[in-house]
Amino acid sequence: MAAMDTESAPLTLESLPTDPLLLILSFLDYRDLINCCYVSRRLSQLSSHDPLWRRHCKKYWLISEEEKTQKNQCWKSLFIDTYSDVGRYIDHYAAIKKAWDDLKKYLEPRCPRMVLSLKEGAREEDLDAVEAQIGCKLPDDYRCSYRIHNGQKLVVPGLLGSMALSNHYRSEDLLDVDTAAGGFQQRQGLKSCLPLTFCIHTGLSQYIAVEAAEGRNKNEVFYQCPDQMARNPAAIDMFIIGATFTDWFTSYVNSVVSGGFPIIRDQIFRYVHDPECVATTGDITVSVSTSFLPELSSVHPPHYFFTYRIRIEMSKDALPEKACQLDSRYWRITNAKGDVEEVQGPGVVGEFPIISPGRVYEYTSCTTFSTTSGYMEGYYTFHFLYFKDKIFNVAIPRFHMACPTFRVSIARLEMGPDEYEEMEEEEEEEEEEDDDDSADMDESDDDEEERQRRVFDVPIRRRRCSRLF
């Protein structure tokens, strides 16, 4: 009879063994785990089991075993303390923190000055004060990043990458939140836009739209591009760089730490290399990386400026008698309309480099298109040093260039038909002048020309650069 009573006794939470319950709790998210504390005394005790909080500390706050040991706290206590500090950013913190950690780890041995230029994180009250100053709420992922590092000191090189031609130099610093607030825009064309970066040489900035205005999506990151054909200064086109701050920052960091952007003279150069953009002829390999320059480009009139970096290398296993010298270059340039231009000239960047086993020669040049994309291909002509009468061609792989997605200014979209037709005629005349001004020239990246520093509310003056090959 007693055995039958035992078998028929109801199964309660209190009577369940501990291990199965802990296993079930291990699948819960932190919110559900906290809620379990209010269900019963038994679940409250089990939910405080410290190993359950280890996963959440690692998942949301990236807290390592070493950090736990240093702080001499249990996992649950660490989770609660961190949540009290940055809990409003829990949906963004792990991605942003990982990006910062990866970036610093990668740059410390390669660009130590850049890492030293980073500022300590801002306080919540600092960010609240900026919101009060600009009259807009900052995106949570932006605030999260600035809690970790409040930008960098305005020094060269900038954290957000550099670009150099013989007569042009750009290096973008990540602005601290107070400096950014000083450049917050309320003028027509850039209403409710906050600068993220600034180049002291060109005045170039990347902006984030903290509010949806003038055709921009909220939280979008972009380069401004004044409409040079419009009489309205509010007509500003945009090259879109990221859909959100997180998208913008993490994609940039991934390009850096994956080796996608080369480190040259302690600076991050924003050249993109396609692994398939390599051609080998005999013992010589040619590879190409490219970059779009928004500060020298415009949508109206269509003028898209690209720079490319070419690496020419002879295999270290080549025979000494294979040493050779570059005599000339040939280019076949095709735009998105299928229009083809052929260019031939002596040397490259005014030089006639000698290539020998194991030696590498690199140079930078640039080109422009009146279409949003295009490609180049061609060959170099060499002669052997030991057999000067013997010449041969080395293939340059086809490499494609395309500008980022852009959005046309809402001021242009709102124009009347008569004004629009007049502007279209002016654009066609401008395109014809650009074609007439094209020249066959090479540019090296050795001599850098600094430009005068400009303030945020002054539109960038676009320089017309001839096409360089």
UniProtKB/Swiss-Prot annotation:
Q: Where is the composition biased (Acidic residues)?
A: 419-449
List the InterPro entries hit by this protein, alphabetically: ApaG_domain, ApaG_sf, F-box-like_dom_sf, F-box_dom, F-box_SCF_Substrate_Recog, Knr4/Smi1-like_dom, Knr4/Smi1-like_sf
Q: Where is this region: Disordered?
A: 419-454
Keywords, A to Z, come to: Nucleus, Ubl conjugation pathway
| Pathway(s) the chain acts in | Protein modification; protein ubiquitination
Give the location in the cell. Answer: Nucleus
F-box domain: residues covered: 10-56
**Known SMART domains for this protein?**
FBOX, SMI1_KNR4
Care to name a GO molecular-function term for this sequence? ubiquitin-like ligase-substrate adaptor activity
Subunit annotation: Part of a SCF (SKP1-cullin-F-box) protein ligase complex SCF(FBXO3) consisting of FBXO3, SKP1, CUL1 and RBX1. Interacts with PML, interaction is direct and takes place either alone or within the SCF complex.
Q: What protein is this chain from?
A: F-box only protein 3
| Gene, per the UniProt record | FBXO3
